[in-house]
Amino acid sequence: MTNYRERLWPAPWLFIATALVIPASLLVFVPIDVVVGAVVAVILYAGCCVGLLLASPVVEVTDRELVAGKARLPRAFIGEAHAFSGDEAVLERGQRLDARAWLLLRGWVQPVVRVEVLDADDPTPYWLISTRNPSALVEALGSARG
């Protein structure tokens, strides 16, 4: 059973910023042909947008595991979970970050949750996961730990 599920969709401003491929491709292809330039611009922009959407990872907590992107952490190895937002989230991503930590960070999602890893054979001390709803993720992780 799924206790929590979130897809880390790109922020709207990212699609606006990606629109800069339109004038860039027009600049390159209009000297060849205006129609070719317009078609290439639209195709490149659409391709970039589809790429952003397809690359959006999923964070999911089930009765069996925590899934963050392509990584999976079995329920038995889920330790304490702590939510951070604002300046605390910035510190967790920067000055407090352990180089051995496993990261699923997205620049357009500020809050993060740190999940301790209890597996003695795993050199990763914790996972740091971007989430738009840190309290719900921490609550789901608490119920997953049992």
Question: What do these predicted ranges mean?
Answer:
Residues 42-82:
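Conserved beta-hairpin
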Residues 32-41:
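Short, aromatic-rich membrane-interface segments at the entry and exit
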Residues 62, 118, 130-132:
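A structural detector for beta-sheet-dominated domains
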Residues 1-31:
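N-terminal membrane-targeting/pre-transmembrane regions
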Residues 17-21, 40-47:
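Lipid-exposed faces of alpha-helical membrane segments in multi-pass integral membrane proteins
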Residues 130-146:
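Cytosol-/stroma-facing membrane-proximal "stalk/adaptor" domains immediately downstream
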Residues 21, 45, 60, 114-118, ...:
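Hydrophobic, well-ordered secondary-structure segments
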Residues 69-128:
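Non-transmembrane, membrane-adjacent beta-strand/coil modules in membrane-associated proteins
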